Amino acid sequence: MEKKKVVLAYSGGLDTSVAIKWLQEKNYDIIALCLDLGEGKDLAFVKEKALSVGAIKSYMIDVQEEYANEYALIAMQAHTLYEGKYPLVSALSRPLIAKKLVEIAEQEGASAVAHGCTGKGNDQVRFEVSIQALNPYLEVIAPVREWKWSREEEIAYAKENDIPIPINLDSPFSIDQNLWGRSNECGILEDPWAAPPEEAYEMTLALEDTPNKPEFVEIGFEAGVPTTLNGTAYSLSELIKTLNALAGKHGVGRIDHVENRLVGIKSREVYECPAAMTLITAHKELEDLTLVKEVAHFKPMIEQKLTELIYNGLWFSPLKQALNAFLQETQKNVTGTVRVKLFKGHAIVEGRKSEYSLYDEKLATYTAQDEFNHDAAVGFISLFGLPTKVYSQVNQKKVEA
């Protein structure tokens, strides 16, 4: 029987390494795909490991700039904080991984794609809904969900088949990291009463260890896109990396969150998102300066829906595309510079300026330079309050009757 081809989203960890052998036993030729999303791993090693375990071909693709400009940027502009806390670190990367899986599958003539998600997480939904949206004819295989092995059984299978066991297997934590941040779950973190141990963190310093003097950074934006730090131009991916280091040094971006998962359970996770939280804070302040009131008040409703769609794996849905079109329209004048103070876990905006600023000091001031027409207030109040006045008059007459 001729073997079918499957493209596997490969991380180099135990699950996806075991999945290569498991898929071989199902009569598949495996093409491994590993993406560089800015997590800082030795991906050349991961690429070679896939081949050594049994893949017939192994891809390693650097998608950092694509991820920054087409995914993280939208999240920043939409101030996406799921349940007011989580900046969608993992949720943002899944549609891009799905997109690349489909592209390689079509390029290689594969009939299926595979991922390493379990049956109780959000990522299985995000991957499979995205893949269906991009190519509904591809079969999707989820080995970890199908084999239902315990961790001990999986390790035994790996040893039987000479699959290398990762040296960090004894770590109690399950970690996912990319440019936009780092998520951490499992181990002691599963107890919502337990304080996260310091070893759960990597991108940020504990407040006790942060500098005792604040650091100031000026972030330049052009049409809603961060382009400079302290006057130096960066590509977006490099800007995010640089700001991760700057803000992380001051303990910015630690998040401890009990969240409501898409699959119906609550999960306690610890996130580190120094650049994401700093950029979202700065961008919001620049919008406050440049957006008209009606747009500024309506946009949070769009942001909330976009956040839900992205978290739930609906990146490629028609509604997400429509809402994104609105989002991009709002960014045309979001150009300027924001000064942020980084200190003891906080990113505090202390100044903002823009050539498109709608703040007019001559109208806002209470000094002798005031140019606001105070006489216009009387007529405005009369008209603005007229419906309330009429309502009160009508109901007062009924009471008197």
From Swiss-Prot:
Record's catalysed reaction(s): L-citrulline + L-aspartate + ATP = 2-(N(omega)-L-arginino)succinate + AMP + diphosphate + H(+)
Regions that span the bilayer: none
Binding, ATP: 9-17, 116
InterPro entries: Arginosuc_syn_C (IPR048268), Arginosuc_syn_N (IPR048267), Arginosuc_synth (IPR001518), Arginosuc_synth_CS (IPR018223), Arginosuc_synth_type_1_subfam (IPR023434), AS_cat/multimer_dom_body (IPR024074), Rossmann-like_a/b/a_fold (IPR014729)
Cell compartments where the protein resides: Cytoplasm
CC annotations in GO: cytoplasm
CDD domains documented for this protein: ASS
GO molecular function: argininosuccinate synthase activity; ATP binding
Enzyme Commission identifier(s): 6.3.4.5
Keywords recorded for this protein, A-Z: Amino-acid biosynthesis, Arginine biosynthesis, ATP-binding, Cytoplasm, Ligase, Nucleotide-binding
Pathway given in the UniProt record: Amino-acid biosynthesis; L-arginine biosynthesis; L-arginine from L-ornithine and carbamoyl phosphate: step 2/3
Gene Ontology BP terms: argininosuccinate metabolic process; L-arginine biosynthetic process; urea cycle
Residues engaged in binding L-aspartate: 118, 122-123
Binding locations of L-citrulline: 86, 122, 126, 174, 183, 259, 271
Organism domain of life: Bacteria
PANTHER family to which the protein is assigned, alphabetical: ARGININOSUCCINATE SYNTHASE
Family: Belongs to the argininosuccinate synthase family. Type 1 subfamily.
Assembly, per entry: Homotetramer.
Protein's name according to its UniProt entry: Argininosuccinate synthase
